[in-house]
């Protein structure tokens, strides 16, 4: 379940497993500043206990500064981890207590884009201990994505059309554009937020 800053404001209970993939300015038409936005997003783990798990992306300059009340499990494409999911030489590894095991090649992830490698690593960290490595690999290699996120719409006259309308911030739009290796024509609209 993905929760927006609006849904998290005033949250009284935290899930046993929570994750924050990254934090970039968003919904600043509603929040007075980025700090207030971060406070709203971090409410997801504010009431966790020692037994709970928080998953953070260590490569994000904001999320790497956050602190867990319970067990911290991280992801990184830039460094090997003792506890978490990391990428090394295009292979995704899971590490627990300093012992690592190979999960899968990043190239086997069905959904395109570097940001989806992060998303898959986060998902693997979230379900670690609840799902087998085989199940994680099966999902990563078969899951085609969700509506409105680089969703293939159709091909007409050799042109492929994709819907990425959920990309409602510059960082999300850039991540989506970087998923394509071929020339892209972007049709965009909306308003500042």
Model-derived segments and their meaning:
Residues 2-5, 22-30, 70-80, 156-162, ...:
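Short, Lys/Arg-enriched charge-dense amphipathic segments
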Residues 4-6, 60-61, 78, 167-168, ...:
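Short beta->alpha connector loops
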Residues 1-66, 72-74, 85-89, 93-94, ...:
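Flexible active-site lid/hinge loop adjacent to a nucleotide/diphosphate
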Residues 59, 75-80, 97, 145, ...:
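Residues that form or immediately flank small-molecule/cofactor binding pockets and catalytic motifs
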Residues 13-16, 50-51, 68-70, 81, ...:
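Short coil/turn connectors at secondary-structure junctions
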């Amino acid at each position: 379940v993905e929760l927006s800053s609006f849904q998290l404001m005033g949250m009284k209970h935290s899930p046993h497993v929570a994750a924050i993939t990254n934090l970039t300015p968003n919904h600043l038409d509603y929040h007075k500043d980025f700090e207030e936005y971060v406070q709203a997003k971090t409410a997801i783990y504010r009431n966790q206990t020692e037994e709970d798990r928080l998953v953070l992306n260590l490569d994000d300059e904001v999320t790497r500064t956050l602190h867990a009340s319970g067990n911290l499990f991280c992801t990184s494409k830039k460094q090997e981890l003792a506890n978490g999911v990391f990428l090394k030489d295009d292979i995704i590894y899971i590490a627990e207590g300093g012992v690592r095991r190979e999960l899968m090649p990043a190239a086997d992830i069905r959904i395109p884009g570097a940001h989806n490698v992060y998303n898959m690593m986060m998902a693997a960290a979230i379900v670690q201990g609840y799902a087998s490595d085989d199940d994680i690999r099966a999902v990563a290699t078969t899951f085609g994505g969700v509506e409105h996120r680089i969703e293939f719409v159709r091909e007409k006259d050799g042109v492929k059309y994709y819907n990425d309308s959920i990309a409602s911030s510059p960082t999300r739009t850039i991540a989506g554009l970087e998923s394509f290796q071929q020339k892209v024509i972007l049709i965009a609209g909306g308003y500042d937020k």
